[in-house]
Curated annotation (Swiss-Prot):
The keyword RNA-binding does not apply. This is Apoptin. One of its GO terms (cellular component) is host cell nucleus. Pfam families: CAV_VP3 (PF04771). Residues 1-28, 57-121 are annotated as: Disordered. It comes from Chicken anemia virus (isolate USA CIA-1) (CAV). The gene is VP3. Keywords: Apoptosis, Early protein, Host nucleus, Host-virus interaction, Inhibition of host mitotic exit by virus, Modulation of host cell cycle by virus. It is found in: Host nucleus.
């Protein structure tokens, strides 16, 4: 049996309630989602939700909805891990080893020059 009566008019499914706090909504338990539709950007702040990673942000027109979008669209995800940076060693012995290698390369003597004389006959 259906829980709703048939003569009940349909009501709104969602109600907008503005935030009651002035503190920023972006907390470890809040995520902000931006959805772009035909030049309009909709920003949603979702608090208390789990993380879900999207493979990438792409654009597709309504005419060609199966398209994956443009390759030149910038990736706007902010939660991406940064690529690992080159770490420099602070160990002085490693610095000395590389310094010695450089000095060996630059100071390796080439063949000694010999004087060439031209003899005219």
């Amino acid at each position: 049996m259906n829980a709703l009566q048939e003569d009940t008019p349909p009501g709104p499914s969602t109600v907008f309630r503005p935030p009651t706090s002035s503190r920023p909504l972006e907390t470890p338990h809040c995520r902000e989602i931006r959805i772009g539709i035909a030049g309009i950007t909709i920003t949603l702040s979702l608090c208390g939700c789990a993380n879900a990673r999207a493979p990438t942000l792409r654009s597709a027109t309504a005419d060609n909805s199966e398209s994956t979008g443009f390759k030149n669209v910038p990736d706007l995800r902010t939660d991406q891990p940064k690529p690992p940076s080159k770490k420099r060693s602070c160990d002085p012995s490693e610095y000395r080893v590389s310094e010695l290698k450089e000095s060996l390369i630059t100071t390796t003597p080439s063949r000694p020059r010999t004087a060439r004389r031209c003899i005219r006959l």
